[in-house]
């Protein structure tokens, strides 16, 4: 039986899916993995809503929001990789308070999850209102990276794999989003991204979805524990000619791997969701300020 999985064409989830297929892990679990590469987030969601794919990679906030509106989507954790703030070593910025009056580039727009967490963290831990005290420059990930390298801006808040590229060029991480969550007393083990699918479809295709999820966690174990598994991915990672970049990307990816779907991960997500709802509001989470109870699929 075949399962169609929708992911962003150039997204990092392809590293896992390629490893699954290269090692015949899908065949071992008696199914055929069909990866459908999509242009962007909107195309990914449209393919899922239109029934062109069975499973997509998305965040649990979107799944909860859809459930609040009546959908029967459920979520299984994939990754807890989040971004962070990167600065130039020559910037004289050694703490968050040093950002006051400076220019920071932000990827992903005004309701990006890392940006929402940064606002909550700055307010609760540093009494800093980043919206007022810091000059904000929103832009696409490669663009804000370029602006940091050229000295046009003082810091960036970017996605983890774009940050890995900056670190490979000698830039330093001031603060990771994972550390921010920890310092706010939230569990940084909360998964951000995961596999989403319809619960009704899962009930009808119980063996297929379990085989896919088993193969996904088996592949994660391989990427976590066997560095040889990464050799085949260098070209896909666009790091075949840059050992420093390869090292940064593989290390940071492995740090974000979720090895299981557990009640503690769901609990951590619930607490993080409440903070995001408080700062991001309806634009981010929709009409409910609490995580929908059935978001995490408890049948697996």
Residue map of PLM features:
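Short, solvent-exposed loop/beta-turn-alpha elements that line the ligand-binding surface or hinge
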Residues: 28, 178-188, 255-269
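Short glycine-centered helix-capping/turn motifs at secondary-structure transition points
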Residues: 23-24, 51, 151, 256, ...
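Conserved C-terminal helix/tail region of periplasmic/extracytoplasmic solute-binding proteins
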Residues: 270-300
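Extracytoplasmic/secreted envelope proteins and their assembly/folding machinery
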Residues: 14, 18, 45, 60-63, ...
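Pocket-lining segment of extracytoplasmic ligand-binding domains
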Residues: 60-61, 137, 142-235
